[in-house]
Amino acid sequence: MSSSTSTIVAIASAAGTGGVGIVRLSGPQSRQIAVQLGVARLQPRHAHYARFRDAQGAVIDDGIALWFNAPHSFTGEDVVELQGHGSPVLLRQLVARCIELGARQARAGEFSERAFLNGKLDLAQAEAIADVIAAGDLRAARAARRALDGVFSRRVDAVAHTLTRLRIHVEAAIDFADEPLDTLGGNQVRDGLTQARTLLAQLLRDAERGRTLRDGLHAVLIGPPNAGKSSLLNALAGSERAIVTDVAGTTRDTLHEAIQLDGFELTLVDTAGLRDGGDAIEREGMRRARAELERADLALVVLDARDPQAARAAIGDAIDAVPRQLWIHNKCDLLSDAAPLDVNAIAVSAVTGQGLEQLHIRLRELALGDGVESVDGEFSARTRHVEALRRAERHVDAADLELGFEQLELAAEELRLAHEALGEITGKISADDLLGKIFSSFCIGK
């Protein structure tokens, strides 16, 4: 963790050359260092032109200096931004001069870490800074911006507040153990549990959507040989990415292809067909296919529409652990009109394009839910947020079960654990190693 007694410095603008480059200082010596660099006047929140000089008085660069006095700054400390020409050579020289004058090189994410430690933003908001920077399209950028504005954090806090009220009622009932729960606000507890479960379910749904907007979806094409998996990948990608032949077992290795679909990135993984037997190379391909399924968010189960039941047998239980599955009957252009089709499957033809539009719609629904946004709009989220919400949901369910048996101490503990899981999202309950891991993934100047 950083120490606010030190003053840190780093280049805050993007790597490479540009019209403008920024060096950022934060800490108690920031203003003093700026003055020693040659900034004659510094008023809070005013821009001042200056020539930045080295130890011998030679001009390093000229530009603008801005001072944000504590606590009215991003980090909550005294912050000075030096804006000069975007030459990496000059920016590095300016940083070196700041270090000579008493600053030290900032670690990755240390400015955001100090903002978190000084209460300027919570952990989910700090992570959203990196998400805004890394957003690949406008929809993801807007979702990250909402998370940075606190939309996600406020909803987490709303659930946490509900759990706090519940814990007060339950722990009060423990102090009066001789009284039945119903005489001690039992109905309020049950109503509160219902409210907490509803809020958590809605928040988890929206967080899963936010994670997809941020990270995309990892979808594995799985099925027996010659079902048309490679042809379907090519059709979805809009290019001939995979080799296609009539020979079963053509695909031996995995092939990854990322496509943009309605505002999120879908990574398609073509895999070897699953069947009994095959040579050593094909068996290795099938092993890799099963390994991909262990990491998959979505299994696209591709079967030959002419005999889907026989094809299902080849897959067995390989997809059981995948949270989301979509069954696709390919080669539907070869079916007669009277041929039966599983009502739970989508009929497509990778060759003619039949059914691909419906497949796109279904993929979007699986990735982003029903498409109904919350009143606050979409926000970005991360895998750790989703996992924490799932833990909270499990503990609330367990608390409900324990209350049914009037096991108040156990119910109170489950509610405490649910509250703790929510606290991990915003950083109100976080281990130092978790904070270090999160902030170390940031840019140096953030």
Curated annotation (Swiss-Prot):
InterPro entries attached to this UniProt entry: G_TrmE, GTP-bd, GTP-bd_TrmE_N, GTPase_MnmE, MnmE_dom2, MnmE_helical, P-loop_NTPase, Small_GTP-bd
Broad enzyme group: hydrolase
Names of the cofactor(s): K(+)
One GO CC annotation: cytosol
Cofactor annotation remark: Binds 1 potassium ion per subunit.
GO MF, one annotated term: GTPase activity
Location in the cell: Cytoplasm
Gene3D superfamilies, sorted: P-loop containing nucleotide triphosphate hydrolases (3.40.50.300), Probable tRNA modification gtpase trme, domain 1 (3.30.1360.120), tRNA modification GTPase MnmE domain 2 (1.20.120.430)
Positions bound to Mg(2+): S230, T251
Quaternary structure (record): Homodimer. Heterotetramer of two MnmE and two MnmG subunits.
Family statement drawn from the similarity comment of this UniProt entry: Belongs to the TRAFAC class TrmE-Era-EngA-EngB-Septin-like GTPase superfamily. TrmE GTPase family.
Name the record gives this protein: tRNA modification GTPase MnmE
